[in-house]
Amino acid sequence: MLILLLHAVVFSLPYTRATEACLRACPAACTCSHVERGCSVRCDRAGLQRVPQEFPCEAASIDLDRNGLRILGERAFGTLPSLRRLSLRHNNLSFITPGAFKGLPRLAELRLAHNGELRYLHVRTFAALGRLRRLDLAACRLFSVPERLLAELPALRELTAFDNLFRRVPGALRGLANLTHAHFERSRIEAVASGSLLGMRRLRSLSLQANRVRAVHAGAFGDCGALEDLLLNDNLLATLPAAAFRGLRRLRTLNLGGNALGSVARAWFSDLAELELLYLDRNSITFVEEGAFQNLSGLLALHLNGNRLTVLSWAAFQPGFFLGRLFLFRNPWRCDCQLEWLRDWMEGSGRVADVACASPGSVAGQDLSQVVFERSSDGLCVDPDELNFTTSSPGPSPEPVATTVSRFSSLLSKLLAPRAPVEEVANTTWELVNVSLNDSFRSHAVMVFCYKATFLFTSCVLLSLAQYVVVGLQRE
């Protein structure tokens, strides 16, 4: 028992000494704690305007996020042989002196994201960081970076640089033979040139989504044979060269959604035998070339939703057909005999749904799965609109049913048509009576009789007008 106790005391001494050393050199505005591989120093949200002058020698991780740091001088962190992670995100850095990170020989992760005033980096900014594996430069509003900025980072595996102002893929990427992941989202990149990714033979994931890419040059990804995920969605691509993706035989995900593509060419995907996810959604596609998907037998999902497709030919998938999911919703489908194969495949596989018909009129609004394709006497498929025409009995076209508004308008126009006013009719009648009776009846009694006759005649006219209105309503 005594031996075990002595053993525990002996082995706990290094841990106790390391903890004491960590706490002894901890900056006043920071908190320090001992971790497995050294000391963790947290100085985030401490209101710091400059980097503390001293850190624990055993520091393995330093967090200086969300302070007010503006400038990093040379050897800004002294000599910290055990430091592996340094985070300076969300500060106000505007300048980093060349050699600022000297004295950090084991640094593997450097985070400089969200320093919007940085804008520029000297070619020697990251000198002496030979073991750096992860570099985060996101949201620094960088316009450009020197061609050899990353040349002294042979171990770099992951580069995050989204939300910048590059306009083109930085030439600093060339020759980064060990880089595996690169993120350039929302960086206003306008084109992917043929030489911008030279030497990147281990690159597995490249994200260029939400940029302004209008052109991808032929062979642009020629040196990226290990690429598995390529994201080009939400750009301005209207077309692609035939050899745009040539050589990407390991590609598993290709996202071209949210562009301006009007058609899908057969040559685009000829080398992508390992492709599993293909996104062509939210384009303006109206035509898919025959055999466009013929080599994609390993697809798990094909997204064609949100386009302008009216028909999709079986020949687009020949000679084989994939067994994955097919997304076709939000297209103006014409559900005639050209889509009978798709209806049959929907019933048999259950891997596609929500194919709403926009035409012909007899099936508009229905789902393709509900459309019944009849057969002619020769056994040929009959389009729904043709079926509707040939089976209808000939006869005169029925008159359109009048609506309440049309009936009222018609009646009103008839009532308002020019007619002799009742007063004019009465006056005319009175004049006629006067002419005919003027010579023989001139007594007061005769005049009274004429007044009564006029009243009677006027009443008859009004009664006739009322009958005309009633008959008009009945006919309408």
From Swiss-Prot:
Residues 19-57 form the LRRNT domain. Expressed abundantly in retina with lower levels in brain, lung, spleen and testis. Not detected in kidney, heart or liver. In the retina, highest expression found in the inner nuclear layer and ganglion cell layer. It comes from Mus musculus. Glycans are attached at residues 92, 178, 295, 388, 427, 434, 438. One of its GO terms (cellular component) is extracellular region. GO terms for biological process: visual perception. It is linked to Defects in Nyx are the cause of the nob (no b-wave) phenotype which is characterized by a decreased sensitivity to light and an absence of the rod b-wave in electroretinograms. An 85-bp deletion in exon 3 results in the loss of 288 residues from the C-terminus of the protein. Residues 1-18 form the signal peptide. Keywords: Extracellular matrix, Glycoprotein, Leucine-rich repeat, Proteoglycan, Repeat, Secreted, Sensory transduction, Signal, Vision. This is Nyctalopin. It is found in: Secreted, Extracellular space, Extracellular matrix. Gene3D superfamilies: Ribonuclease Inhibitor. It comes from the Eukaryota. LRR repeats lie at residues 58-79, 82-103, 106-128, 131-154, 155-177, 178-199, 202-223, 226-247, 250-271, 274-295, 298-319.
